[in-house]
Amino acid sequence: MANGFKFTPAQQKAIEDTGKNILVAASAGSGKTRVLVERVINKIKQGVSIDELLVVTFTEAAAKEMKERIQIALRKELSTADSEEEKRRYLTQLSKLNVANISTLHAFCLQIIKQYYYVINLDPMFRMLTEDTEVALLQENVWDDLREKWYSKKSPEFENLVVNFSSDRNDDGLSELVMKTYQFANANPNPDEWLNNLVSEYDLGDQPLMESNFYQNKIKPNVLDQIQLAKDNLKQGMDEANKLGLEKLYQTFEQDCATIDELQDFVVGCKEWNNLKTTLQNFKFKRAKSDRGLDDDQKKQKERINKTLRDGSKKIIEDLSVKYFALPEDEIKELTQKSKQIVETLSEVVKEFGAEFSKEKRRRHVLDFSDLEHLTLQILNTDTPDGRRVKERLKNKFKEIMVDEYQDTNQLQETILTTIAHKNPGNMFMVGDVKQSIYGFRLADPGLFLKKYQSFATDDNDDERIILAENFRSMENVTAFTNLIFSQLMDEKVGEMAYDEDARLVYGAKYYPEETPIKAEVLVYESEDSSQESDDEPVNEDFSIDNKAQGQIVMTAKRIKELVENGEKIYDKKQGTIRPIEYRDIAILAPTRKNNLILTEEFKRLGVPIFVPDAQNYFQTTELKIMMSFLQIIDNPYQDIPLVAVLRSPIVGLKENELAYLRINDKTGDYFQAVESFYDNFEVEKASAFAQSLYEKIAIFLKQLTEFRNMAQQNELASLIWKIYEETGFLDYVGGMPGGLQRQANLHALYERAAEYEEMSFKGLFQFVRFINKMQTKNKDLSEATTQVSDDAVTVMTIHGSKGLEFPVVFLLDATHKFNVGDLNKPYLLNADDGIGISYLDPDTRVKTDTLMKVIAGKQALKKLAAEQMRLLYVALTRAEQQLFIVGSYKDKNEALSKWKKATQSESLVLNAGIRASVRNFMDWIGMCLTRSEIFKEVDDTVDAKEPEYIGELPVKFEVKFYSNQDLRGENITLDENSESWLKQQLKKIEEQEPLEINDKQYRIIDKILQSKYPNESLAKTTAYQAVSDLKRAFDDPDNNMMQSLEIDWQDQVPQGINRYVQNELSLPKFMTTKVKVSPAQVGIATHLLLQKLPLDDEVTLEELMQLLAQLVEDKLITSEVAKEINLNQIKVFYTSDLGRKVLKNKDKVKRELPFAMIIPAGRLFSNVDNDVEQPILVHGIIDGLIELDDEVIIFDYKTDHHTSEDKLIENYRGQLNLYAMAVESMLNKKVSQKIIYSLDLGKSIVL
């Protein structure tokens, strides 16, 4: 805020009002911290000592900031104090500040426990479990023991519980459920009572189902809410039809509303479940009124309204029938009773787990954060003289309890605070913004805030609600844009609160100069081309998703570069001037960390400096993956994947050809056996230089592995890890890699994790590796070690991580990221209010059925998800001070507009509830809201939007920009060194350098260096891994004789596109290419597949070929487009030829599609490389077919080349067949007697 700030009337009330409970609803940027500090100072002025206040903050950083601000404020008051008495007061308060109760609730609870531990007979000598991983490790250990205990009981009830939530492979599902249920229970003041209530929800009693509390309190209100939602759709349809003059459509919706009213009345009065079930299952709207003589536009509008609103209402009623009323009453009761038994057993198991976990923590003298809260509450509620004395002492001590970020508290924390609070009058001062409650995954309960928000506003309540609506952070365009979105999105139905006049942001940052640029932009990447693969490439299922992310990131980087390099301006609050944007002014916020690795790579490539504090998951970093692989093989070397990972890593340094060589020398058994076999059988005198080099590497590796394995048996895990660092030099090596400091910090962190593991009295490498693997499986990665923040770089963080922060320029990335609804598909749903809803798995039929409790829990989960995602979007938008950019991706502009136009005709300010609830990403919400503004017509003038009056009055400006692949293509070939700023900097350095004076001798030395030629320059351009087909394609005119002896002539001019053979310039990413028609290569591959799959019967018929081709298309091994191009007659003709008949005759001796790999010295393969060069090349390929007779082998290769002469086929493929022959003779130890090319196009065999 600007200097000379004056408090608003609402802020003044929040500072001065007293004698009651006060809830301050402080919108984003409203200065709530300033108000809290000023309230503390005001209390001190009134004679309250700072140690008589309890100030609870959400984080330790917030508590530290609060103390610092209070200290500054007290010093200011001291400097202006008139009397000695005042000065003494402020000096006394400054001296007490360090011991004042300004802390997180956990820190306050820890203080209570340390001071009053004797009340509950707690051993005061305990250590805090500050790491989540420590807690998880201990829980795993306790659960493993308890689970075995339950299994040994052979309890039928426990067996049913296991079967219901486990797979046929393991019981991880049950383990996860127990841990989550324990977590939910522990967020309550009385966990056992909450667990008991889980069971009581399933007790329907003996009365009819519709008389049960569950039906009356849960099902019936939900059913009526859904019917009302359908009715709201129909009413909106009536309004729209009426305004468009569609009389018959209006009449249709009018009669539909009447039908819905009848259904609503029936539900209210119905007393019998099966009657209601039958009514809903048979429910239909009456036939729509016929509407002739409409013009094209009216027809289009009618179709849209019917599809969106009438069909939507039908779907709502159908869902009621399917989800709630699928079963008759007796089956519902039976299902519920069986499910009750399972929930009862679950409750019992979780209670026992909680008791055992507590017992184990006491045994180890440790406490976790949950213990702090429960033990504090236990102390306060202990009904003994000591317990009652402690509670009264704390109540009398604190004249006021101030709670910051009140919306993020849970029921347990609320109970602790209200236990020591005064009742009449109240003395709680709670500050927060329920629109920023985004920690549902931590079991924060925004309902506590909402309940007070509504009740404190009523006239008959003694407590007070104060609203701080002014936003002193953002420019008017940002606040107006936020209001534009949320006034249409958020209400009690979808969002849990109304975004009304009380909730809207009020522009208060009047200190921005008028000339400060205004920007709010929506950037859409059109990903249509990115979902298409080139014709000769296999389809990767994740490809389109990855490239949507890449397209968004390139688009974002492009826009950021434009802002910085074009000198776009922002207002610098500290300097009080307008200046050009710098990278440090920009923050990228994302819903998840999923794309951080791509983001880091792309920004670096495009020359945009970036700081990503959590760029990748800790155990997904290269250095940690290598170390974990090493630890795995130290525990057990007979694991191929981690073994090869270590061998290939810098620790051992084997190349791909060396790895292949080891396997070729021993094709049976585990890979470690192949390594040992090579080492044990190595003969120095017969070894090539290649083998000798490999042997030396393996010898060092095996020596180190033996040493490490011996050390591991002594259970010295941390020492073992450090020994690996010392012996291999790996810690130093990663320090020299890009991001070396971060990598070294990560390796140090692994050492520290291992030390912590051992401190917990856990031993053994196997258990440590197993624990880490479990953590990764559950997506509970450890935190990455932190390093220094870059000075001038774009900051990247999650939206959750940005809460409480502000940035001049904000990019909300991946706004089309789908909300995570994966939990809804699990066989259980947990809810703090509704308990648990489960799916029941019939042990006999294996059929899974959702209980009514699961249906209710699902509805609640979706409602809470939508509300929390809405709040998350609010947090993201309100981080921006001056400029806001929202980034997303659609297939194309039409797809985006079609989704955004769904709600344009609604004249009410808030969009249709059903449409809002059905949305699964931020951008669809935002787009729907923007289309109703007149400004949007600049994007699409066909939008027939009904702009509500409030939106029209908003002083908002925004742009929507669409970027295609073509727009971004130039960005994909820009390297970071080619950025304009980098080039200018380098040129300036060169210009400032003084010219060097050199003598003749120095000149000759430099000249010799510059003119020298690397003797095997061609090898530098050659990959060590070659496909036979690539070798063939690399030469337009290979010398036949030299090919025969495997001396292939190198040509300096290599055809473009042979990028497997030559390490050429990088080609464009696949998403920058477009799909072309069916290629000959595709037809060739498909033809070979057909020949491979064809049964070798006595006679091959055309009908058989057609059936096989149809099957391959059905199995999606060949596309229908490619199948049309395959010439089946040519294949039939082949089997009537001499070669074809020989294949059929010797079908048991025929091998088809035979893969091979062999090592060939480069000097033998390439004619321009010296023959004595031992640099090996790994050649691999697939032989179409061979016939293995007693003492000879015939190899054959099908060719689908069109219009190619016999001589040209020989010229093109002789070398390839020679390589095949060499490979076959090496593998089978038999002479290849014939090498045959069969041309399907010519219909003849060509013997070489």
From Swiss-Prot:
Enzyme Commission identifier(s): 3.1.-.-, 5.6.2.4
Highest taxon of source: Bacteria
Positions of ATP binding: 26-33
Pfam family for this entry, one: PDDEXK_1
InterPro entries to which the protein is assigned, alphabetical: AddA (IPR014152), DNA_helicase_UvrD-like_C (IPR014017), DNA_helicase_UvrD/REP (IPR000212), P-loop_NTPase (IPR027417), PDDEXK-like_dom_sf (IPR011604), PDDEXK_AddAB-type (IPR038726), Restrct_endonuc-II-like (IPR011335), UvrD-like_ATP-bd (IPR014016)
Limits of the UvrD-like helicase ATP-binding domain: 5-475
Subunit structure as annotated in this protein's UniProt entry: Heterodimer of AddA and AddB/RexB.
Function: The heterodimer acts as both an ATP-dependent DNA helicase and an ATP-dependent, dual-direction single-stranded exonuclease. Recognizes the chi site generating a DNA molecule suitable for the initiation of homologous recombination. The AddA nuclease domain is required for chi fragment generation; this subunit has the helicase and 3' -> 5' nuclease activities.
Protein's UniProt name: ATP-dependent helicase/nuclease subunit A
Species, as recorded: Ligilactobacillus salivarius (strain UCC118)
Gene assigned in the entry: addA
